[in-house]
Design a protein with these regions (language model features):
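N-terminal cap/lid segment of alpha/beta-hydrolase-fold proteins
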Residues: 1-32, 262
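Short beta-strand element of the alpha/beta-hydrolase
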Residues: 34-42
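The serine-hydrolase catalytic nucleophile loop
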Residues: 43-56, 234
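Alpha/beta-hydrolase active-site loop signature
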Residues: 44, 71-76, 157, 257
Length: 277
């Protein structure tokens, strides 16, 4: 399966939210066997990146299901990036997972997508523990998506607080507080600055994870570059310490950067996915 063939997949669109907050989310679905794969991308990225396409190609070669999508304000989805918050993007992640995934899933989250994957796992655990879930029929339970495991690539849980707000100068914090937005220079993509809003920072505080144990109920594989300028390796260690001790593996790639998109990095990511299922 060539990358050009993968790119020719037409996206499906779903509506998430209601009223003024309704937005159209672009989803690409590859039918196949379980365990399926679902890709959760990073902040200000899209589902056509190197890692996402490589995973989709790997799934296609093995007849595995694969789901990719763009958050609102990203890629082919509707909505404005400036309106984005962690809760808003989590709502979209849950909607895509529930609508397009069936059976066990390997959730692969990159950077912010790592935070999304952890929040998604927590949300799934809450729903499975609900009285409604226990009363569901055997057929409906078999059709429901579940977690086979998480593969987290340079995961950035709590990044709005720990890696942004706490690292900003008082001048930048003041601008965000007073103007509601700060344009941050970017070293990726076209290099254009992108908006960081007060809403992103403040709403993100509703979803912080690193202050207590994180129960995900499945195996976790973490891949982290020691040379990552955006998510320091210490952040990955802090996350690993918050996860259950059983079946959590942290792989430190000594010469790896934030993107982890080199051929050798892709090979490690795919190996982690294959190890889970």
């Amino acid at each position: 399966m060539t990358n050009s063939a993968i790119n020719d997949q037409e996206p499906a669109f779903i509506e998430v939210g209601s009223g003024d907050s309704q937005r159209k989310i672009a989803v690409r679905v590859r039918a196949g066997a379980a365990p399926g794969l679902i890709w959760l991308g990073g902040f200000n990225s899209d589902m056509k990146g190197t890692k996402a396409l490589a995973l989709d190609a790997w799934a296609a070669e093995r007849g595995r299901a694969c789901v990719r999508f763009d958050y609102s304000g990203h890629g082919e989805s509707g909505g404005s990036f400036i309106d984005g918050t962690i809760g808003r993007w989590l709502e979209e992640s849950v909607a895509v997972f529930e609508q397009f995934c069936r059976g066990p899933q390997v959730v692969i989250g990159s950077s912010m997508g790592g935070w999304m994957a952890l929040l998604l796992a927590r949300e799934i655990a809450r729903r499975e523990a609900s009285p409604a879930a226990s009363q569901a029929s055997a057929v409906s339970q078999a059709n429901r998506a579940s977690l086979a495991g998480l593969v987290l690539i340079a995961p950035a849980p709590d990044f709005t607080e720990q890696l942004m707000w706490n690292q900003f100068t008082p001048e930048i914090q003041q601008e965000i507080q007073t103007r509601g937005v700060w344009l941050r220079p970017s070293q990726y993509g076209d290099g254009d600055p992108y908006p960081l809003t007060r809403a992103l920072i403040e709403e993100g505080r509703n979803h912080l994870l690193l202050g207590s144990a994180i129960e995900v109920g499945c195996p976790v594989r973490i891949l982290q570059g020691a040379q990552d300028p955006d998510v320091p390796w210490q952040h990955a260690f802090a996350l690993a310490h918050r996860l259950p001790t059983e079946d959590v593996v942290l792989t430190m790639i000594q010469d790896g950067d934030h993107r982890l998109s080199r051929p050798q990095d892709i090979a490690r990511i795919i190996a982690a996915v294959a190890e889970i299922g």
